[in-house]
Structures are given as C-alpha cells and as structure tokens.
C-alpha cells in the first residue's frame, strides 16, 4: 500500500486532481457592451496622440520664442512667455481660461505677436481666410481647435443672430419651430464635417431650414389648390377642400338663375306642362334607383330577353308521295305474340329458330374431397374418372351415330 502511494504514477495522479479545473469565463462578454462605440475609442486614442504631439511642438515653439527678442509685447504675452521660459507646463485648464481676456481686448497696446499658447479658436468668418503657411503659429492654431466631443459656441451664436428683426412677420408657432434644434443637420457630434468647404456652419445662414417646415399643413384654400376646390365642391361633402369664401361665392349663383327661369315660365304659360313632366320623370327615376338587391335582380330577370330556339318537331303525317321500297322483315303475328308473352319483350325476326330448338344443360358431377387441393393424393382423381365414365357414355349414346344405320353411314359407292 505504501509502495503504491509512493510510486511516481500515484504522485502524478494526485497532482492532476489538484490542478484540474474548468475555465468558465465568457470570452464573448465584450460583444455585449453596447454602450461604448469602437469608433469612439479609436478616435479618443487618436486625439490623445495628437495632443501629445501638440504639447511637444508647443514646448519647442515656446523655447524658440523665449530665446528671441522680447520687446513690444503685452503684459499678458510677457507673462505667458515667462511662464513658458521657466519650464513649467501649462495645464489644460489654464490654456482654456487664457484665450478669454485676449479675445476681449484684440486692440491691446503692443499686441503685435501674441503668445503661442494663447491663440483662441478661429471663428466661422475667420476660418475661410486661415492660412497654413504661417509656420509654428499655424500649427498652434490647428492644435487649439476643440475636439468633436466638446461643446461648440456657434450654436448659441446662431440663436443670438436670428432675432425678431430678421423675422418680422412670423407666428408664435414659427418661432417655436425656429428655436428647436435641427434634427439630422449636424450638432455637437457631427459639426466638424465639411467645415473646410463652408459646411453646415455656413449653410445655416444661407437657408435656415431646407426642409420646408411642414408647409403642407398650413394651406387652406389658396391659389395652389384653387383648381382642386372647383372640382370637389360639387360633392358638397364634409372633407372637400376649400374655405368658407369658396362656398359663399358658389352658392349665390344658383338663386340668380332661378328668377330667370320663373320669368321665362311666366312669359310662356303654355310651355309649363311640358317642362314639369320631365321633372316628375326624373324624380321617379331617382326613386326607382333606390331598391334592394332582390328587387334589382327581379328587374333584371324581367328585362332580360328570353332566348327563342327553333325546335324541329317530327312529322306524324305520312307524305302522299311516299313509296315502299321493301317490305318489313317483321311479321305482325310474331309482334302480337311477343306482346302477349310477358317474358319476352323484344321483337323476333321471321327466320328465328331458337324457339324450335331444345337446349338441355347436363349436371356436372360434384368433385371428390380428394380433388379439392389438386395435388393431394390420387384418390380424388380416381373417383372423378369413375364418376365420369358411365355418365359420359349416356351422353354419347344420344349424340353418337349408329354405325349400323345406313343413314348415318351411307355407302361410298
């Protein structure tokens, strides 16, 4: 027992039992993460890499600018270069807060060359004239552009530019639709696309909303559908297109026509009766048209023309010019006998000899029990031969000729 436990095979088995396990981690759990977008992750990594490159270039540019002359600079610019010359890195919060005072005072004294870290974000109007051939300053301006995820101030500027003076004849509903953000026209996510060609930032000022803003719901009865009102007013339904003016304009035309008809009727009293009769007929026709399905079917059956067939009838009279070609083969007495006999209903020809013949049906012998199988034993066949013997002779005696009779066997000579 001890030897068995001390063997290397047992030790290996014990080690396998201790190290045995099952990995149950789900390797597809990353596919269930629907909140994060892989493209956003890639863009974020690219943005971080660009920021690192921009910081490196900005530090190099600050060091190169600090070594040059410092005369004719604004206090803000001097402080900025002094901080850069000291070797201390500017934080992202300071970079965002510094462009504000510089933007408020663009005409500051001695504002010839500003600090490279204090460049503000270019505006829409300035972006078209932006030149890339300005050396390190152009690179810094490109570095200071905000990422696509950050909030963009041109949305608020657009709302401030569109004032009531620009839309003097708008309605409250139009103002509500105008204040709403545009759907599908870019925004904080896709605003940077195509801005180099005067993209959505410039197109907003050319045409405010190119979709039409549901103008089809605000048309009542104007010139765009005037033809449609004339066509549909004859129905006089609830949903006919048109306004109250159209109905008021159409209705007075009918009363104006009635007095003319009355004057004509007064001028010609003799023509009153013919004029009234067609009106009564029209009323009757309208009443007849209102009927049920059964009444309509009955009316159709009555008005339907009946088919007339030319049916040829057999002639019962014998023509006078008829000639007997040959006499009938049937006899009258045979026909009478057939009618008298109940068992025969068919006619018999004159040369029928079936009634004169005597037909006898012989009784076949019952087969023996042994012959039921056919192949069993031989007793059945023997009995059958014995039974057939005498009966066959009796039958043959009636039919076979007599050799001694000269009538049956006449002489050959």
Curated annotation (Swiss-Prot):
Domain of life assignment: Eukaryota
Effect of residue 336 to R: Decreases sumoylation. Abolishes sumoylation
Ranges of Gly residues composition bias in the record: 184-201
Cross-link (Glycyl lysine isopeptide (Lys-Gly) (interchain with G-Cter in SUMO2)): 213, 276, 336
Matches recorded under InterPro entries: HABP4/SERBP1-like, HABP4_PAIRBP1-bd, IHABP4_N
Disulphide bridges, residue numbers: none
Entry's Gene Ontology cellular component terms: Cajal body; cytoplasm; cytoplasmic stress granule; cytosol; extracellular region; Gemini of Cajal bodies; nuclear membrane; nuclear speck
The record's account of how the chain is modified after translation: Methylated. Methylation is decreased by phorbol 12-myristate 13-acetate (PMA)-activated PKC, in vitro. Phosphorylated by phorbol 12-myristate 13-acetate (PMA)-activated PKC isoforms at Thr-354 and Thr-375.
Pfam short name (any one): HABP4_PAI-RBP1
Compositional bias segments (type: Acidic residues): 404-413
Residue(s) carrying Omega-N-methylarginine: 70
Coiled-coil regions listed in the entry: 40-64
Compartmental location: Nucleus; Cytoplasm; Cytoplasm, Stress granule; Cytoplasm, Sarcoplasm
Keywords noted in UniProt: Coiled coil, Cytoplasm, Isopeptide bond, Methylation, mRNA processing, mRNA splicing, Nucleus, Phosphoprotein, RNA-binding, Transcription, Transcription regulation, Translation regulation, Ubl conjugation
Modified residue annotations for Phosphoserine: 7, 36, 74, 108
Tissue: Highly expressed in brain, heart, and kidney, and moderately expressed in skeletal muscle. Also expressed in a variety of tumor cell lines and in activated but not resting leukocytes.
Cross-link (Glycyl lysine isopeptide (Lys-Gly) (interchain with G-Cter in SUMO1)): 213, 276, 336
Other known facts: Able to bind hyaluronan. However, its intracellular localization suggests that this interaction may not be relevant in vivo.
The family this protein is said to belong to: Belongs to the SERBP1-HABP4 family.
Matching PANTHER family: HYALURONIC ACID-BINDING PROTEIN 4, INTRACELLULAR HYALURONAN-BINDING PROTEIN 4
Full protein name: Intracellular hyaluronan-binding protein 4
């Amino acid at each position: 027992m001890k030897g068995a436990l001390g063997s290397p095979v047992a030790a290996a088995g014990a080690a396998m039992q201790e190290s045995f396990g099952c990995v149950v981690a789900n390797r597809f759990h990353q596919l269930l993460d629907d909140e994060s977008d892989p493209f956003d992750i890639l863009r974020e990594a690219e943005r971080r890499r660009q920021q690192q490159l921009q910081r490196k270039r900005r530090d190099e540019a600050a060091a190169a600018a600090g070594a040059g002359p410092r005369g004719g600079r604004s206090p803000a610019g001097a402080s900025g270069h002094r901080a850069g010359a000291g070797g201390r890195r500017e934080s992202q919060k300071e970079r965002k807060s510094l462009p504000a005072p510089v933007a408020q005072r663009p005409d500051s004294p001695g504002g010839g060359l500003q600090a490279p870290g204090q460049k503000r974000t270019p505006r829409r109007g300035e972006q078209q004239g932006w030149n890339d051939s300005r050396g390190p300053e152009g690179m810094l301006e490109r570095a200071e552009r905000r990422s696509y995820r950050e909030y963009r101030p041109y949305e608020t500027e657009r709302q401030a530019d569109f004032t009531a003076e620009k839309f003097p004849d708008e309605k409250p509903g139009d103002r509500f639709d105008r204040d709403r953000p545009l759907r599908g026209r870019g925004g904080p996510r896709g605003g940077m696309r195509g801005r180099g060609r005067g993209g959505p930032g410039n197109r907003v000022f050319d045409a405010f909303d190119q979709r039409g803003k549901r103008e089809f719901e605000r048309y009542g009865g104007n010139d765009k559908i005037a033809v449609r009102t004339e066509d549909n007013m004859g129905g006089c339904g609830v949903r006919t297109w048109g306004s109250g003016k159209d109905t008021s304009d159409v209705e007075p035309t009918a009363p104006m026509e009635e007095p003319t008809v009355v004057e004509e009727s007064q001028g010609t009293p003799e023509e009153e009766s013919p004029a009234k009769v067609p009106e009564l007929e029209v009323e009757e026709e309208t009443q007849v048209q209102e009927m049920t399905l059964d009444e309509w079917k009955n009316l159709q059956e009555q008005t339907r023309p009946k088919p007339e067939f030319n049916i040829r009838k057999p002639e019962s009279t014998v023509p006078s010019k008829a000639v007997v070609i040959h006499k009938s083969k049937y006899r009258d007495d045979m026909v009478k006998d057939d009618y008298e006999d109940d068992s025969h209903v068919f006619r018999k020809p004159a040369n029928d000899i079936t009634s004169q013949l005597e037909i006898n049906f012989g009784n076949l012998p019952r087969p023996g029990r042994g012959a039921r199988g056919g192949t069993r034993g031989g007793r059945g066949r023997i009995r059958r031969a014995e039974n057939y013997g005498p009966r066959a002779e009796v039958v043959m005696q009636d039919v076979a000729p007599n050799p001694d009779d000269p009538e049956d066997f006449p002489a050959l000579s």
